[in-house]
């Protein structure tokens, strides 16, 4: 059996970071949105090989990006193991191989690894499920703070460490430019720097919520915010000039996406987004730039991680 699932990239329209909790995580107030950059994960059963104990994953390969682990540390591999453990029946299973095709910038603050985990959960659910949405979300939260959102998609408010999700109402599509850097940033390092700098927390999203209801792109852009910006700029000062270039080129607003170093720019139209993308590339300050729209999907069954194909 071969199952391919797809999951979108995310960006944060707002990321407010509160104090660190006893468990080491920070209390967050965030607004997630999927954009139509994506990864796919293909799970293939190796029917000639049965596994009675230990991981059923025997091989993991990645194309489209360098530096992504191809062993049990990969979040997709861990997603298989976590969901297999939830089976009621403990009979032997076929071994599986995983292949990840990357279209989301790696270590860029766009939840590429979390998207892979979410797509993998959908694939395993199609293989040996159904487990039910509640179980999938529970396992997703165990795997990582962004995995539940990648599973569900759309535009959502996230609290707790980002795993407590509520749908948000929006009007229309937003046009984005995604500017990726050649080298990623470690999320723990960014949060550590944030704690050192100790900037003011911004936990109120009421103005952004109202702007999203209007569909007015300029108004949405006015309220984009990320508390991790100062930390990301401290670790990667060159991001400041990237943000300045995007605004100079005509974007309504630009912010660091999540923990960075990817930056995203909100534009009035698809045409304007193309202009900003070309300006960023011509300036020679970014590794790659893409245009994207959000929220990513036009149909409810494709708004989050979802199955593309199943074949025997």
Curated annotation (Swiss-Prot):
Key words of the record: ATP-binding, Isoprene biosynthesis, Kinase, Nucleotide-binding, Transferase
Any one Gene Ontology molecular-function term assigned to this protein's record: ATP binding
Enzyme class at the top of the EC tree: transferase
Enzymatic reactions: 4-CDP-2-C-methyl-D-erythritol + ATP = 4-CDP-2-C-methyl-D-erythritol 2-phosphate + ADP + H(+)
Pfam families reported in the protein's UniProt record: GHMP_kinases_C, GHMP_kinases_N
Single Gene Ontology BP annotation: terpenoid biosynthetic process
Active-site residues, record numbering mapped to chain: 10, 146
Pathway field: Isoprenoid biosynthesis; isopentenyl diphosphate biosynthesis via DXP pathway; isopentenyl diphosphate from 1-deoxy-D-xylulose 5-phosphate: step 3/6
Keyword Kinase: yes
Residues holding ATP: 105-115
EC numbers, comma separated: 2.7.1.148
Superkingdom as given in the UniProt entry: Bacteria
PANTHER family tied to this protein: 4-DIPHOSPHOCYTIDYL-2-C-METHYL-D-ERYTHRITOL KINASE, CHLOROPLASTIC (PTHR43527:SF2)
Family, as annotated: Belongs to the GHMP kinase family. IspE subfamily.
Physiological role: Catalyzes the phosphorylation of the position 2 hydroxy group of 4-diphosphocytidyl-2C-methyl-D-erythritol.
This protein's name: 4-diphosphocytidyl-2-C-methyl-D-erythritol kinase
Originating organism: Corynebacterium glutamicum (strain R)
């Amino acid at each position: 059996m071969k199952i391919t699932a797809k999951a979108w990239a995310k960006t944060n329209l707002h990321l407010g970071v509160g104090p660190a909790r006893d468990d080491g995580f920070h209390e967050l107030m965030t607004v997630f949105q999927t954009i139509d950059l994506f990864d796919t994960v293909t799970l293939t059963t190796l029917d000639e090989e049965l596994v009675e104990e230990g991981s059923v994953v025997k091989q993991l390969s990645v194309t489209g990006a360098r530096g992504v682990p191809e062993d049990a540390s990969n979040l997709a591999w861990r997603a298989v193991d976590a969901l297999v453990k939830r089976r009621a029946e403990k009979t032997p299973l076929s071994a599986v191989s995983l292949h990840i095709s990357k279209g989301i910038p790696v270590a860029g603050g766009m939840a590429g690894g979390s998207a892979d985990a979410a797509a993998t959960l959908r694939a395993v659910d199609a293989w040996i499920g159904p487990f039910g949405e509640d179980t999938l979300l529970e396992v997703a939260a165990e795997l990582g703070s962004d995995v539940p959102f990648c599973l569900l998609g759309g535009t959502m408010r996230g609290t707790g460490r980002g795993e407590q999700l509520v749908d948000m109402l929006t009007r229309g599509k937003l046009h984005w430019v995604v500017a990726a850097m050649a080298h990623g940033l470690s999320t723990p390092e960014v949060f550590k720097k944030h704690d050192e700098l100790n900037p003011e927390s911004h936990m109120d999203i009421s103005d952004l919520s109202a702007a999203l209801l209007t569909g007015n792109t300029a108004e949405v852009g006015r309220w984009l915010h990320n508390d991790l910006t100062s930390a990301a700029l401290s670790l990667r000062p060159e991001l400041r000039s990237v943000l300045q270039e995007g605004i100079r080129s005509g974007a309504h607003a630009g912010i660091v996406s999540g923990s960075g170093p990817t930056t995203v720019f909100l534009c009035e139209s698809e045409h304007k987004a193309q202009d900003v993308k070309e300006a960023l590339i011509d300036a020679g300050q970014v590794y790659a730039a893409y245009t994207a729209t959000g929220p990513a999907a036009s149909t409810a069954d494709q708004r989050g991680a979802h199955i593309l194909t199943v074949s025997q």
